[in-house]
Amino acid sequence: ECSKKTKTDDQDDLSVDAPSPAQENGEKGEFHKLADAKIFLSDCLACDSCVTAEEGVQLSQQNAKDFFRVLNLNKKCDTSKHKVLVVSVCPQSLPYFAAKFNLSVTEASRRLCGSLKSLGVHFVFDTTIAADFSILESQKEFVRRYRQHSEEERTLPMLTSACPGWVRYAERVLGRPITAHLCTAKSPQQVMGSLVKDYFARQQNLSPEKIFHVIVAPCYDKKLEALQEGSLSALHGSRGTDCVLTSGEIAQIMEQGDLSVKDAAIDTLFGDLREDKVTRHDGAGSDGHLAHIFRHAAKELFNEDVEEVTYRALRNKDFQEVTLEKDGEVVLRFAAACGFRNIQNMILKLKKGKFPYHFVEVLACAGGCLNGRGQAQTPEGHADKALLRQMEGIYADIPVRRPESSAHVQELYQEWLEGINSPKAREVLHTTYQSQERGAHSLDIKW
């Protein structure tokens, strides 16, 4: 039975009546019966009760103990069992460390890298390069969908797929009518897994299973995403990400260690090069798919150069709109929907055919990825709004880079993926979605 959460601090969530679905075959249903209870939609999505027993065991193993298990294994003399330990850090985690330790974001990245290497981590990467690929592939897919869209073939709106909580909810509850709109480009975490376990492994002459890959992320849903990452044939059955630790979990490890360790620059996938400067994509608290796809679509479809993307808040600050007008007509209408009240309204209108948007960046957390529950919470488990405001200010000051400007990404398309739009690029950078049949196994939420 669903262990319904009872958090009440998120005022942006709307509670809904949830009828009790039947269960079959004695297995855990995708969303267990809720005994006509009132639930928060965010709790429904973030709750771990819909995971299978096997997933539950695997999730429980993704913690600091698992991390230290590998570190300690590497200290033993049986070198055949040693692992190359790689940690990849999401850019939305860095403002948390900067705020936590009262450092600039560059200093925080160096402190984090130095601390991890002092423990025995071999390489520390930034996942921004993986987000480059995710955004570039999403840009191409949106343009294709826009050109193909018609009354007979409704390929729009395209909904982003970088947020694992939202994607799992779409797959498990909403089903095919909604998952057909999900962008097929893999999330930055999934791309990073392939970069580390495929490209980097070959550069180091290692088999994928010899690498233990840890992602540092702002939210707990990334742990579940790691379990669901499809294994590429090139990875020989190995998952791209072995363990996800939240920013808060890593901060605890740092606080328990020696804070006087020597700082170190973030590594890159390119030999001895180091990341001297922290950069991000153009998103208020996320990977910035909306802004980059909007600019690309404006240029590609309408030959319009958009330098500044102007957001307009509509019903609340977590639902914002961006439009492009040409000859007095709106030709592009994008939106960012954060938090479950806005997701709820979006799905309702989409099902009624009254949703006028071409593209929506969908994020489970109100305020975006910076507000992930793995970092923007008080010790008591409440939302830390003061910390969130501080992180937003820090994140806004990080220099923005456009994915098209990365020479390394273009190099990787050729060297690693055998060219842009190649069969290997499609296999490595795109995914498919598993949709449950609406019925006994779904939580039939009344929108």
What name fits each language-model region?
Residues 1-447:
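Iron-sulfur-associated redox domains of electron-transfer enzymes in respiratory
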